[in-house]
Amino acid sequence: MIIFILLWLLLVLYSFTRQDLNLTWYNQLTTPLQTLGWYQRPLVTLIFIFLSLLFFSCYLYCLRKHSTPGWNVLFLIAFMGIFAYPMFSYDLFNYLFNAKMILIYHANPYLQTAIEFSPDPSLRFMQNVHTPAPYAYGWTMASLLPGLVWFSGKFTLAFWAMKVFIAGFWLGQLWILKKLVTKLFPVEPWRFWLFALNPLVLVETLINGHNDVVMMFLALLAYMFWLNYAKLKAFIFLLLSASIKYATVVLLPTFHLRGGKLDIPAWSSLALLAVMFTRPDQLHSWYLIWAFSFAVLAKPKWLVSLFTALTFGALLRYTPYIYFGHWDPPVYFLRNLIWVSSLVLTPLLLKFFKA
């Protein structure tokens, strides 16, 4: 587990190779890493591949040897991730600015766009400044809590507050998963650690700071209430989940079923995977967290193996972006080729989980 923590620390440090050149943040410490990331792309690509493969290998080793940590280590992992730079996405900056628009500028991010506040220095290192908020109202309201830190006038404090907020929901999701795994699979505790230590989940949540765990925390809480025959609470929390990012609304039909009629986690994971393909031009890696959150609770181990394999490919598919430095062709094709190719790991992982 010490090696796992060290590799995680290296990934946290690696994240600063992608720091936007317009963001003068920790500058004395991060300038060498920025130079590596932006001007030595072949080398930084090899480093990413090497770190990712090592991290996944250590992840599987910990699962095989049952070398799993206590909650204190999970808190340490979360703490380290708070200080990382969101290396593969600018979404976190949009979360922050949407909250700032409401709290500081008294503007509606669904009717106005960030570009209308061009004097704000945050726009120097933001993307998608010409579009209104794409998230559901539930997330925008929730983001106002960490957004209150904007009243300090300090960007760094607001950034850390948002990271802490998202890390808190990651820990909350783990708490619910622990209860669900204990209830549904008392002799297979590895299912919990399969999600808790998954490299894709850690990178996309604790480094990149995506809000998907907020949606999935509420969805899994709804499922837990459903298992306990609290249908009204389940329905309410599922609606709250959909109010974050819409996707989990597809789970509503499954909450009308009960007993042995259907493996809810299995079908939920497949339904959420299908949602990803409704916008094939935006097959973002972090969307896989939706399906994987339920896949670890699915009864068929082949399905667990398939989704675990997809998480491997979902992280490695950033490789073309790092190498080319943009998202234009041939990056889109290469990214999806890597992702599809990761399916060849499914039978190997199936043997691994059955061993």
What are these regions (language model features)?
Residues M1-L51, I264-L288, F292-A355:
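Transmembrane helical bundles and short interhelical boundary loops of multi-pass, membrane-embedded
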Residues F4, L53-C62, W160-L184, M216:
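Transmembrane-helix motifs of polytopic, lipid-linked glycan transferases
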Residues P42-T45, Y137-T140, F151-G172, L180:
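Loop-to-helix entry region of an early transmembrane alpha helix in multi-pass inner-membrane enzymes
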Residues S67-G70, L177-P199:
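Transmembrane-helix signature of polytopic, membrane-embedded enzymes
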Residues T68-A161:
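Intramembrane catalytic core of multi-pass membrane enzymes that act on lipidic substrates
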Residues G172, I176, V214-A230:
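Specific aromatic-rich, kink-prone transmembrane helix
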Residues L202-E204, K231-T254, L270-F277:
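Membrane-interface alpha helices of multi-pass inner-membrane proteins
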Residues L206-D212:
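Short acidic/glycine- and proline-prone juxtamembrane loop motifs at membrane-interface regions
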